[in-house]
Amino acid sequence: MVKLIKIVNPHGTKVESLTEVYVNPEHVSYIVEDEQMTNLANQGIIFDGLHPNYKFTRVIVDTGGRTEHFTVIGGVSEIANKLKNSKQLLRG
């Protein structure tokens, strides 16, 4: 399992909170840069106290019959490395 910081923004604009989420790397279908969140951060309207240079990644997870997606703090390569390193540890 990999710990990521999930952005909670139910209305798609201002971030209401941040929360930890643990993801099984085996269930991640793909990851992609969340350009909308990056644009909001660059405009300074995302979240008080969050550095505007942060990158954001949308994580798409297969939950067995349905797909769930959410945005986490971190660039695509950073998140990919976390997922990859976790898989290597799990496989021994």
Task: Give the residues covered by each predicted segment.
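Eukaryotic intrinsically disordered, low-complexity regulatory linkers and tails enriched in Ser/Thr/Pro
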Residues: 1-92
